[in-house]
Amino acid sequence: MLYIGVDLGTSAVKLLLMDEKGGIKKIVSKEYDLYFPHPGWSEQKPEDWYSQSMEGIKELISECDKSQVAGISFGGQMHGLVVLDENDDVIRPAILWNDGRTQKETDYLNNKIGKDKLSEYTANIAFAGFTAPKILWMRENEPDNFNKIKKIMLPKDYLAYKLSGTFCTDYSDASGMLLLDVKNKCWSKQMMEICGVSEEQLPKLFESYEVVGTLKEDIAEELGLSKEVKIIAGAGDNAAAAVGTGTVGDGMCNISLGTSGTIFISSKTFGVDSNNALHSFDHADGYYHLMGCMLSAASCNKWWMDEILKTKEYSKEQEGITKLGENHVFYLPYLMGERSPHNDPKARATFIGMSMDTTREEMTQAVLEGVAFGLRDSLEVARSLGIKIERTKICGGGAKSPLWKKIIANVMNLKVDVIESEEGPGYGGAMLAAVGCGEYDSVQEAADQLVKVVDTVEPDAKLVAKYEAKYQQFREIYPALKGVFQKFD
C-alpha cells in the first residue's frame, strides 16, 4: 500500500509518497505566497494551501497505481489562526506562527491572567506566536470578523477539513494554541472564557494516528482516488518530524540544528517545569513531549562565517579546531533574543574571554560550543523533571558537521545517532497515515521498523569531564549580563 504525507510549511507544501516498508517513492513541493501587510505581521491565504496541496497530490500520484493509496496524513506549521464563517468561507487570511502583532495580548495573558494560571490551565505560558493571543487580537481589532467566527482551526486541519469534511485537530498541534489542557487532553474552559470562544467553535480532538474520515466524494473524483482513502489527523510539524526521526517512547530525544534549534524530548509521563522554560505538549504517539527552542542555532555559525569571516568554507574553518574542552572563549548564542530556557527577547549574542592570543579557530569553536551549551540548558530542565535521557537523534543543516556533532555529544554527554534519511514532517505524516490504516500497530512500532540509524557519535569520558567544567562557567554568564541586556534598545 501507499501513504501520503503532507508537510504544510511556511514557504511551501512538501508532499511525500511512502510505501508500506518506509521507502520514499516520490517527493513533490509546491510554493505559495507569504504576505506582510504591516511590519511584524505574517499572513497566508488558506485557499493557497489547499489549491497547491491538491496540485501537489495530483503530481505525486501521477505515475503510481492509485488504487494502492490507502491514507493521507499531515505535519504542519503550528499556531496559525484559521477562521471560517457559517458558510465555511475563510473570514480573513491566516495569522501565522511568526506573526508579531500580539505582544499586547501576550503581555495581558502573562501578566494580568498570570503565568501561574496559564500553566495551570494549559501547562504553558503565552508567546506571541501562539493561537490564543491571535484570537484576543481579532476580538479587539476586528470585532466584525470575530463575530462571524463559526470554526477555529489550525493550518494543517484546514486541509483535513477540505479533504474529509471533518472539523478536527490533533492533540500535539492543539497544544500550541494555549487553549488545550495538555495534561487532561481537553479544551480548557478557563481559556475559552478568557478568549471569548465556545467549544462548538473549536475542532474535535484526535490522536495524531487516528482516522478522522475518508476523502469526500468530489475530492476523490478530482484526484482519481477511491473515496475509501482514509484521512488521518496528523501532527504539528515538530511532533511529526519527531515521528519521522523515530523520537517516540520514553526519554527519546531529537536535536534539530536548523536556522533555529530545537531539542525535543518524548516522555510517557506528563511534566512541566516550574518556570515554564520548556514547552509542554502532547506528542503524536499518544503520550507527551517537552521542547526547548533556541531562536538562533545554525544561524549563529552562518552569521559568523558569512558576515564576520566573509567565507563560505565552513568545513575548512573547522579543520584547525583540535583542542576541544580547552577553549577560554565563550559565546552566548542569542542573536535574536532567546526562547528556551530564558524567554528573554532582549538577550543578545556575546563573546567573552578573549585575550591577545585568542585565535580565529578559538572564536569559531566558541560559536559551535555556545550553541551546544544553549541546547544543554534545555536538556537540564528536562532532566530536572526526572526524565532519563541517554542518547539523541540529530538532524538539520548543522548536523552535517562531524565536529559539531562531536561537540554536542560531549557537552551533553549523550550518544548522538545519525539517521539514514531526513525528510521531516512529511515522512512523519506518512508514517502516521500507515499507522492509522493498520499497517503498524502503533507509532512506536512504525518508528522501530522504519527509522534506520547509520552512525553514532559516542561521548568521550575525558572530554565530557572537560566540557562539564566549561558548561558550569557558561551557565554563569547570562545571569551576570541579563541586567545589561535589559538596557539595550
Question: What residue spans do the PLM features occupy?
Answer:
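Short glycine-/acidic-enriched loop or helix-start segments at secondary-structure transitions
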Residues: 15, 81-84, 93, 265-266, ...
